[in-house]
Amino acid sequence: MLSFGVTVLPDPPWTRWLELIQLAESHGFEYAWTYDSHVLWQESIPTLAVAARETSKIHLGHFVTNPATRDPTVLASSYATLNDLSDGRMAMGVGRGDSAVRYIGRQPMKVADFESALTMIKEFMNGREVHWNDKDLQLKWVR
């Protein structure tokens, strides 16, 4: 069966953003996405946390986030926390950081760096240990 989702722009006020996500859920949409360009729109991690608690069925996530503006360890921890808050309803759309990074005067990640960051994020999200910056790291609380 085909899945349907909606992208809701994270413009103020966040209460209207939440209303639109709740409306999508009430109409049977399976996914609600939001953007992650931290200078262009409101910060989306806290609003996704609110949506996780104020909805019960719809899957939530970024369309897209990136490991160029969000450190991969922070991104993995944030999504693991959001996934816990939402009872497993988080979905991560992830890219190299084109618009978010260009807007602040930087270049998107190189493909090899993106692949490395994505591998690390996936390992963290699955509770596995990651060797990074000469350290063995793990999100030990991830279920």
Where are these regions (language model features)?
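Structural motif corresponding to the early beta-alpha repeats
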Residues: 61-78
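N-terminal beta1-alpha1-beta2 module of alpha/beta enzyme domains
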Residues: 1-63
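Internal, glycine-rich beta/alpha segment that forms the wall or movable "lid"
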Residues: 2, 76-143
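Short, glycine/charged-enriched secondary-structure capping and boundary segments
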Residues: 19-21, 46-49, 74-77, 106-109
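A short, GP-enriched loop/loop-strand-helix hinge that lies immediately N-terminal to
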Residues: 59-65, 91-95
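Conserved N-terminal glycine/acidic-rich loop preference
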Residues: 17, 30, 69-74, 101-104
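Positions that flank functional sites
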Residues: 39, 66-67, 97-98
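Residue-level preference for long, well-ordered alpha-helices that form the structural scaffold
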Residues: 13, 71, 110-114
